Amino acid sequence: MINLFLYCRAGYEKDCAAEIQQRAAELNVGGFVKTNRNDGYVIFQCFQVGDADLLAEQIELDSLIFTRQMFAANELLKDLPEGDRVTPIVDALAKVHRAGELRVETPDTNEAKELSTFCRKLTVPLRQALKRSGALLEKENPKRPIIHVCFVGPGTAYVGYSLSHNSSPYFMGIPRLKMASDAPSRSTLKLDEAFIHFIPKSEQEQRLRSGMNSVDLGACPGGWTYQLVRRGMFVAAVDNGPMAQNLMDTGQVRHYQADGFRFEPPKKNIYWLVCDMVEKPSRVAELMEAWAINGWFKEAIFNLKLPMKSRYKEVSTILATMQEVLRENGIDDFHLACKHLYHDRDEVTVHLWLKPSVGFNFG
């Protein structure tokens, strides 16, 4: 296939485009981006047919900061006939065999979502036709490729596939999380999504277990603390502002009225450090580096607020500097990952795991 289709948050197309251009160049794949502001997606069109398949396989989705989901796609299908939109789509997928799932989607914009009812109606007859053609298995198979049909306008769609081991498990790359009625703020969904995204389901029981000690810097009113408490952890909540009373009543939270940048934990056996402070991203990164160098935590999740321009460049520079600082201070065994999550706005979420080679214990 010739195109790589990348879903992103509307307004972040330039950042998504800058990132995929760099990553494709690293693999010596030539091409150019096609996108419009607030479309909610980016097209990377390769110069060589087949290069999109290579990108879809060799670029890890989780390594892309601003991409929620991606798939290798054919040329844009235009003016699909109202009487039969199924046949042209099936024909365009002639080279796809024995896929395990079909997703008929739209970009995450209000305009595109107006097509969602149509997409639902199309899914059943399209699924049946793809099964008859051999492009889709009779039963869903999570180990086989996923067929994507993304309508970007009425009668206009990109069609292609993603590989199941390098694809978001969620429709449109968006996890559907419920806001708990007793959570102090909607920011709680950011940490909930971060845990789901960065911690494999098979390891969550060990790495997010009850009884762990944690610290929340900039905790007020307690949106992130709520997620730690919900998982049975003990939390040192650091903020000059007030904490939600229902969290304090659990007996799991100790509130330190202090500046998060000056706080030193009285106990150093901290597994989780979390931080969502409205501050310059470089300053937050430096704080996380200091805690890591002091060995005060095992895993951290923190948000970096983004500038208005050159967001990909800024984040890349901060992450590269962080890796350099850690290594200069003798910390070579670490895992660093970053994602613009669905519940993030003008920010990205970073996960830092120290000494992953020793597993889930301090070492």
Swiss-Prot record:
What keywords would UniProt list here? Cytoplasm, Methyltransferase, rRNA processing, S-adenosyl-L-methionine, Transferase
Give the organism, scientific name: Shewanella loihica (strain ATCC BAA-1088 / PV-4)
Which sites bind S-adenosyl-L-methionine?
S187, C220, P221, G222, G223, D239, D259, D276
Q: Report which reactions are catalysed by this protein.
A: cytidine(2498) in 23S rRNA + S-adenosyl-L-methionine = 2'-O-methylcytidine(2498) in 23S rRNA + S-adenosyl-L-homocysteine + H(+)
The protein's matches in NCBIfam families, at most eight in alphabetical order, are given as: PRK11760.1 (NF008734)
User: Which Enzyme Commission number(s) are on file for it?
Assistant: 2.1.1.186
Offer an example of a GO molecular function term for this protein.
S-adenosylmethionine-dependent methyltransferase activity
UniProt similarity note: Belongs to the class I-like SAM-binding methyltransferase superfamily. RNA methyltransferase RlmE family. RlmM subfamily.
Q: Which gene encodes it?
A: rlmM
Fetch the SUPFAM superfamilies from UniProt.
S-adenosyl-L-methionine-dependent methyltransferases (SSF53335)
**Listed name of the protein:** Ribosomal RNA large subunit methyltransferase M
